[in-house]
Amino acid sequence: MHFNNKNKSLDCLNTKIWPSPAKINLFLSVTGIRKDGYHFIQTLFQFLNYGDYLIFNTTSDKKIKLINKIHGIRNENNLIIRAAKSLKDFMWKNKNHDTPGVKIFIKKYIPIGGGLGGGSSNAATTLIALNEHWKCKLSLNTLADLGLQIGIDIPVFIYGKSAFAEGIGEKLSLFQPKEKFYLIVIPPIKISTKLIFNKFILNKKSYLKSCNQYLKKPLKNDFEPMIRKNFIIIDNLINYLSKFSNFRLTGTGSCIFSEFDSECKAKEILYKLPNKIKGFVSKGTNISYLKEILKIRSNFNVLS
């Protein structure tokens, strides 16, 4: 779903409904691999005005329920459930035993296994929304710490600002790239980040650079050669689309994207996609729609 303040399907002041925006990695460089398998990276996150939305209804039975299951993901592995349980456990350990339950509904638009951060974004939205619904009154830093225990990418969604990430992705520095239009192309496959990390062989370590140093050269993704070699459909798509623009991988895929100065130009290429290949055009934004909604609701005093 495309987000904007005029969107009638997402009422800005309806505190039961919360946006969960997608992200892209404008570049991704692998600078090393730890003994435990985690990768040292440098990457630049930017948000899209596109994503899922979640609906939260508190209950008196203290149970956490996801009303509609996400196909292919078991509840115990679902980051929404894990985030809600993490917050509830934190409140319990801090002597708050009156935290109610919740029923959660998700409307899914972000493709699963696409490298757009859907699961991490869903978890971040859950932590922020339940922090309000359950009147936990925790700081963003505390929520980010809880999120980091679940997934490396979750803190950037908690803070809601574009950022240059280092370390294993947990060290964030605010950075504001240009807000361009992006054509996101969705191949009909899912790619497991964990699987790619396990298979990735670091043949040549990228040197540590500043974000500005990366932006002076053509942007790239160190996982892309491996992905293109192992997933021929992505290789074929990038080769085909290279006639129109320079496309590259976001995250560990499967989605690829290219940036444009105008929405019209991006849509022009969208209409040239091969049959059965989906895509969408979205504006990049340095402030996530979730953060915008949080600010609007605070200004109108509709939050707890």
Swiss-Prot record:
GO molecular function list: 4-(cytidine 5'-diphospho)-2-C-methyl-D-erythritol kinase activity; ATP binding
Catalytic activity: 4-CDP-2-C-methyl-D-erythritol + ATP = 4-CDP-2-C-methyl-D-erythritol 2-phosphate + ADP + H(+)
Functional pathway: Isoprenoid biosynthesis; isopentenyl diphosphate biosynthesis via DXP pathway; isopentenyl diphosphate from 1-deoxy-D-xylulose 5-phosphate: step 3/6
InterPro entries for this protein: GHMP_kinase_C_dom, GHMP_kinase_C_sf, GHMP_kinase_N_dom, IspE, Ribosomal_Su5_D2-typ_SF, Ribsml_uS5_D2-typ_fold_subgr
Key words, A-Z: ATP-binding, Isoprene biosynthesis, Kinase, Nucleotide-binding, Transferase
Keyword tRNA processing assigned: no
Annotated residues for binding of ATP: 111-121
Alphabetized Pfam families for the sequence: GHMP_kinases_C (PF08544), GHMP_kinases_N (PF00288)
Role, per record: Catalyzes the phosphorylation of the position 2 hydroxy group of 4-diphosphocytidyl-2C-methyl-D-erythritol.
HAMAP family: IspE (MF_00061)
Subunit record text: Homodimer.
Family note: Belongs to the GHMP kinase family. IspE subfamily.
Protein name, per record: 4-diphosphocytidyl-2-C-methyl-D-erythritol kinase
Lineage: Bacteria, Pseudomonadati, Pseudomonadota, Gammaproteobacteria, Enterobacterales
Gene name of the record: ispE
